[in-house]
From Swiss-Prot:
Keywords: RNA-binding. Pfam families: RRM_1. It comes from Schizosaccharomyces pombe (strain 972 / ATCC 24843). SMART domains: RRM (SM00360). PANTHER family: HETEROGENEOUS NUCLEAR RIBONUCLEOPROTEIN, RRM DOMAIN-CONTAINING PROTEIN. The keyword RNA-binding applies. One of its GO terms (cellular component) is nucleus. Residues 1-51, 140-197, 466-487 are annotated as: Disordered. GO terms for molecular function: poly(A) binding. This is Uncharacterized RNA-binding protein C3H8.09c. Residues 1-34, 140-169, 177-197 have a biased composition (Polar residues).
Amino acid sequence: MSSSSKDSSFQVETPVQNILETSTNSELQDQVSSPYEPDYNSPVKQAAASISALQTQDDTLFNNVDERTLENKDGNKSDDANFDQVSGIPSGSLEIPILNSATSNIRLTPSDTYNNIPVSDTNNEEISKNIYGAPILESTSSDFQSKDSLSTTQPSVSGGNGSTSQSPPSLDVEQNKPFSISNEPVEQETENSSTKDLQVYDFQTASEHLPEQSLQNTTYYDPSKTYSSVNFEEIEYGKSHEKLDLPYRTTDFIPYSKDLSTSPEAHRTSIYSYSANLPNYYNEHNELHEHHNPQTPSSPESAYSPENLQLNHEAQNVEYLGNNAAEKSLQMNLEDEQRFQQFLKDEESIMSNWYPGQFPSASRLFLGHLNTKSLSKRNLWKVFKIYGPLAQIVLKANYGFVQFFTNEDCARALNAEQGNFVRGQKLHLEISKIQKKYQNQIENMKKGSHVTKSNQYSEMIGNLPYPTSSRKRTRSPLMSKGKSYDRKGSISMSKNFSPDCEILVTEDCPKEFVWGVEKVFQERRLNIHTTCLYRDSNLQVIIKSCIINSVKSIILINAGLAHLGKVSVQVFKDGSSDSEVRCDEYAAVDVMVAASIVHHAKTSLMHSAASSTPSYNGERIVPDVPSPCISTNPNLPALVGSLDSVNLHHLLGFIQNTYSTTSYIPTRVSFNPNDTGGSFGTITSQSQFVVNEMPKNYARDNYEALHSQESRQRSSVAGNKQLQKILEQLAELKQPDF
């Protein structure tokens, strides 16, 4: 079919009118009045679809259809258009744009006209009305593209050379129904007439969204390309997963499916982000931990979600620093580590010599509700060491103890640390109560009742009674007349006073035991002086001061030895040179044995040779030569004279061997008087006095021998002269006659 001239343009209404005329009025009425059950194969509907497609091209609703010229496949305008003789649809490629059926109405631009009235002067609400009351599609003028710019994936109606064109494809998977197009009967077009009340709508409530519908703004047409140029910067995120290459599939815009067997897919917003929900902790360098993602800060809701509970727990297993400023001080430097190791040594020594009532009653701090798996003794030492010296730290399953030396230090730590956090644990502090089994002993000691203690120490010392006046003494027995004691360790003595024995007592030693030791030494007629050792005392300086002041021996008593009823003894003797002092020590011996050792050292010096080298302060110290055996039998010369030469020879050899045998092997310690530090071992108020320690059972095994020697030394000088005569006679008979 062709037109006669170029001026008489092609009129689309001619085939449509022919089709309408061939239809009966009842058939047309049935099709128009039944919008929900249309006849999709009706030529009327197909022709109306073609008219709608032609009128919506180039974003314009045409006023005069007969002035519209069509483009063929080659892009040339022609007055003649080829129509399919059956359907009446023009041949050639014709693509129908797919509109969004989920939105509202068609919107016209101000350049469009509606019923010969500019759209700008027309109320859009009038245009959006539908005579059938069905939902109307919404789109902008930019949604209607030219046929070259339409996507090749859209359904098309093609025809040519007499072939039947394909009907519009189905967009509803279930019903397989195309879009329904309704229109009133088309009247004869005039120059000023236009299509009237043309409405396009979709009866389906759900349909797929195509990727082009995710664009908010106009897609740009590029004639050099066969696809639409998409501005990805203006894409609304989340509208279509087909446009965005997401690593997962979302169900935001998946069509509703009635298939109950289909498993639900994960929603994008429900997928858990672990990197965004990690706790935001900082290390000691104020840097983020490695597991934290700074681009996705954690939210308070996700940080405490049940799904993330285990993750948060694992993240907190690293070294916890927390937000509390006090917890950052748990980091220990080299000096702190050295002091902590010294504390462990002192703690072991204190606990080995512990006895009830050693510390004040309110000096022990109780720590409750502790998780000892994440808390160490080092952490508690770092926290509580600033309040005073610590004696002991104990950690049990769910609680612990911190032992101070004074009540004041303990109270200060309680007030300062109550409720604070250590490695994420809140401190619940209380003053520890004394156990009932120790209360009676401590109360008796506080009241001044020495009945129990005196009986106990009397058995240890040797059943020696305490002086009755000891209970009435008001002055401490630890300080005596004759010299003054400085807390730093120096001892100043008068020139006329040089004690035989210096007793060094720690401040935690029971006074009852000290009084008993003093009594034993006084009964042996030994000059003694008692000095108290404080925690800040320098023992090496004290020992050096004793040696310079010609003190012959030192007795050490601490709490541990007092609990066992023992003392430690050191005896000083001159060495081979002036810079050398020989020191014999007897560790942990009985009090009676210690008194005998000191007395023996004193008498040895008294009977030493007068030609010995002067030692200190111009005083001569004679060598330690055992005193000879003294016999009181006046008939000894006659008995010796009656012996033959052989027996006399054996007797003389026996006497010489007896005199040359010593009761112990002395040890020598190099000592320089100008050395302020000294060369002797050091002790504290809790440690034992150890300098070249001798066997502990040595003094006990030789106590009887020492006692017998002391008895023989009390003989008169006349016996010594008689012995000298006997020795002279034996010397003459040394060579036997054969």
